[in-house]
Regions:
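Active-site loop segments of alpha/beta catalytic cores
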Residues: 1-44, 52, 57, 70, ...
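A contiguous, low-structure linker/loop signature
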Residues: 87-123
Length: 291
């Protein structure tokens, strides 16, 4: 289906050339991304809904084509200049992988969060891939249909899978995970490693869909790659020591970096600065987003 976004093959060629050169360290200027959004009826400028409410805020029985109609209006109201490009991010909330693993998903006007379905000892927690999980099926459906509908006109992003301890906090609660780091560190290490392996599976299955458009990859953040990229993160790491970061988070980041061509890290808050030297030691981590 054609989409009127004012972005043509020559624009794509320029974006791909600039970003490819930037990753190679050969671009002799900074990347500059400019986006212009036309005013939409009933949507204030600067609203979180400029690009639409999260996918997860709609009932699960809402037809996917109807959802994409809603997002297409917003895509067609946006223009990309410089090194920016047309993208659509299937937003199901930060760390939706917790939802894939059966955490309860809650939405409010301006946020999404997760809670465990039931409280259980950390020793009993056994996260496993569930191909029939409703949120996983929804993510696959909207990603696949977006690629089929917009083809090579729009870069369809990976959803925000989350970081291993962020996901674990959603399955246990943040408070319980903080206690378990002290009381049951071996169990935390077991689950952190298991979640990393599940993360890689979810990433790969989504990559098999988005690569069909032939427009590289992009995560929830404004980075583009001709190959496999992602904005890795561990917001939970703000609350833990460098020693704990080295044991429970760094192996996850290193493993994910090894599976990606262009990995970035989302350094969210000054509480993560104590971990910076360890992050910089990862040869395959290509950059850090300083928030």
């Amino acid at each position: 289906m054609d989409i009127e976004i004012g972005f043509h093959e020559e624009n794509w060629a320029q974006v791909e050339a600039a970003w490819t050169a930037w990753w190679a360290g050969e671009l002799e200027r900074p990347l500059v991304m400019v986006e212009d959004l036309e005013r939409l009826p009933g949507v204030s400028m600067g609203s979180i809904y400029e690009m639409g409410a999260p996918v997860c805020s709609f009932p699960l029985d809402t037809p996917a084509d109807q959802l994409l109609d809603y997002y297409q209006v917003r895509l067609e109201a946006r223009r990309s200049y410089g090194d920016a490009w047309p993208k659509w991010w299937p937003n199901l909330g930060p760390g939706i992988m917790a939802g894939f693993l059966s955490a309860d998903l809650h939405t409010a006007e301006d946020t999404v969060w997760f809670e465990p379905v039931e409280q259980m000892p950390i020793q009993d927690l056994q996260p496993a891939f569930d191909a029939e999980n409703a949120w996983w099926q929804r993510t696959l459906e909207v990603t696949r249909l977006a690629v089929e509908r917009w083809g090579d006109q729009v870069s369809v992003a990976h959803t925000d899978l989350g970081g291993n301890l962020d996901i674990l906090a959603s399955l246990l609660t943040t408070e319980r995970l903080l206690f378990d780091l002290h009381d049951h560190p071996e169990e935390v290490a077991r689950l952190a490693g298991r979640l990393t392996q599940l993360w890689l599976r979810y990433y790969d299955e989504l990559y098999c869909l988005v690569e069909l458009a032939g427009r590289g990859t992009t995560p929830w953040a404004a980075i583009w790659s001709p190959a496999r990229c992602y904005m890795l993160q561990s917001d939970f790491a703000y609350m833990i020591s460098p020693r704990m970061f080295e044991r429970f988070v760094l192996p996850d980041i290193a493993t994910c970096c090894a599976a990606l061509d262009h990995a970035f890290y989302h350094l969210d808050g000054k509480g993560q600065i104590p971990h910076l030297d360890m992050l910089l030691s990862l040869e395959r981590l290509r950059g850090i987003q300083w928030i």
